[in-house]
A protein has these predicted regions:
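ASCE P-loop NTPase motor core, strongest for the SF2 helicase catalytic module
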Residues: 1-106, 126-151, 157-163, 167-477
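A short helix-loop-helix "switch/interaction" segment in the helical subdomain of ASCE P-loop NTPases
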Residues: 112-120, 150-156
Length: 477
């Protein structure tokens, strides 16, 4: 119906879903300008949407993106393949000239020659793309925006979590993963299952202890002896830390655990929080185990993939406009992009995305135009586990993005090439210290798993919770 009125208008605004489904209509026209908002959606050149968009005929092309590089520099090639086809060569040529040297220099075992080659490739890429990239950060355009403070909140695993973690290091699954990582034909399915398993162990034992778990009888005996239940929050270092963090923020404080005067003050100065999880099952734990049982005074609402798209705006509006709602529970996938949640001034990440841009986008749901308070961001990290590796990978990817696309991006001098070799070199001091501190309680297999992965899982793999039943069988020693 709208297509029939096309010639009466000078501007067409369309969602990416419409472009994909009605591609014939958009490809049949010759446009003067084609502007992609959140243009990093075409970072994967092999998707149908990317192929359709790159076939659109237009005199001028422009991409708007807060995160043009999320995982690797090959994504930048895909964006330029839309803007200026051929400017960075073919995908194969780009990989050979830029992608491969940069990836090799990232390897912890890379030689000084490989590190230097990676730095030179990065510098060359920066020089070539510099004239076509304009970067503006919030601090440049929103000088009245309150600051955003990011803090890492470390928590220790419970005794049961430590047992499950150590059992994994002695299991057949660990041997299978080690073989997969070191073999020429890596079986990424096993790696993802192992990572998913360990991530759930870091969250709460009940997420992995099912009837098919080989240690289920020993775990039940342990729980019986401790006179607790499997779902108890004391078996999760993260839930205990989350409870304390919320209480420190004045959320969930009642007269029973505070004086009347302090309780009144906590209500007056109370913060409101966004709590992000990767997995819906962990959101369930926070809601059903922490809030309903241990913090019943907390008022909350929830936004995840089970909420119809048409109902999400109403939930956002209700949270922003009703200060009596303490917490909004969200999955990073659903709530991490495009929403305005300035009703909150506290953001808590219970889990973390491999892609640092996803977490940055999520925390900026609160830190945006309209926010009047300082935004405090807390990242719960299970000490001595693969989560510390995840945060290390996040830092590396942010350094890559910030080196290619600098803060100013107005001249070649804006890129400090003297620090590039440090970016790709192993920080031996910190690495050794970390290794000594964590080797006693961190399975060596985790390091092998993560260093052996060439590509980190995407949104679809996050959305699909792997069936771990078959994987459980390989946990037997």
């Amino acid at each position: 119906r709208l297509q029939a009125n096309f010639h009466h208008h000078n501007l067409v605004v369309a969602s990416y879903d419409i472009i994909r489904t009605d591609s014939d209509f958009f490809l049949a026209k010759h446009w003067n300008y084609c502007i992609l908002d959140e243009g990093h959606i075409i970072k994967n050149s092999k998707t149908k949407l990317s192929r359709v968009i790159k076939e659109i005929r237009a005199n001028h092309r422009l991409i708007l993106s807060g995160t043009p590089i999320q995982n690797n520099v090959l994504e930048l090639w895909s964006l330029f393949d839309f803007l200026m086809p051929g400017f960075l060569g073919t995908e194969r040529e780009f990989t050979s000239k830029f992608g491969k040297p940069i990836l090799q220099s990232r390897d912890a075992k890379s030689s000084s020659k490989e590190q230097e080659a990676g730095a030179l490739a990065m510098e060359a890429l920066h020089k070539q793309t510099l004239p076509f990239l304009l970067r503006r950060v919030k601090e440049d355009v929103l000088q009245d925006l309150p600051p955003k403070i990011i803090q890492d909140y470390y928590c220790d695993l419970s005794a049961l979590q430590v047992k499950l973690y150590e059992d994994f290091s002695r299991s057949q699954a660990k041997k299978n993963i080690d073989q997969s990582v070191t073999s020429e034909h890596k079986e990424h399915g096993h790696i993802f299952q192992a990572l998913q398993y360990l991530r759930k162990v870091c969250n709460h034992p009940s997420l992995v202890v099912t009837p098919s778990h080989p240690e289920v009888h020993n775990i039940i005996n342990y729980i019986d002896q401790s006179k607790t239940s499997l779902n108890d929050i004391q078996h999760s270092g993260k839930l205990l830390a989350l409870k304390q963090l919320l209480l420190d923020c004045g959320i969930g404080v009642t007269e029973s655990n505070n004086s009347n005067e302090d309780a009144l003050n906590s209500v007056v100065s109370q913060h409101r929080a966004l709590i992000f999880c990767q997995l819906k099952s962990m959101l369930d734990m926070v809601e059903n185990t922490l809030f309903k049982i241990n913090m019943p005074s907390v008022t909350y609402t929830r936004l995840d993939g089970s909420v119809p798209a048409g109902s999400r705006h109403n939930i956002v509006q209700r949270f922003n406009n009703d200060p009596s709602i303490d917490v909004l529970l969200l999955t990073t996938h659903v709530g991490g992009l495009g929403l305005n949640l300035t009703g909150a001034d506290t953001v808590i990440f219970v889990e973390h995305d491999w892609n640092p841009m996803k977490d940055l986008q999520a925390m900026d749901r609160a830190h945006r135009i309209g926010q009047k308070k300082v935004v405090n961001v807390y990242r719960l990290i299970a000490r001595g586990t693969l989560e510390e590796k995840i945060m290390g990978l996040q830092k590396f990817k942010l350094n890559i993005a910030n080196t290619v696309i600098t803060r100013d991006n107005s001249s070649l001098q804006s890129m400090d090439t003297s620090q590039l070799l440090d970016l790709f070199a192993v920080d031996s001091g910190k690495e050794d210290k970390s290794k000594k501190a964590s080797d006693s309680n961190k399975p060596q297999s985790v390091k092998n798993i993560l260093e052996g992965m060439e590509e980190l899982w995407d949104t679809d793999q996050y959305a699909t919770e792997y069936d771990l039943d078959n994987f459980m069988g390989s946990l037997k020693q």
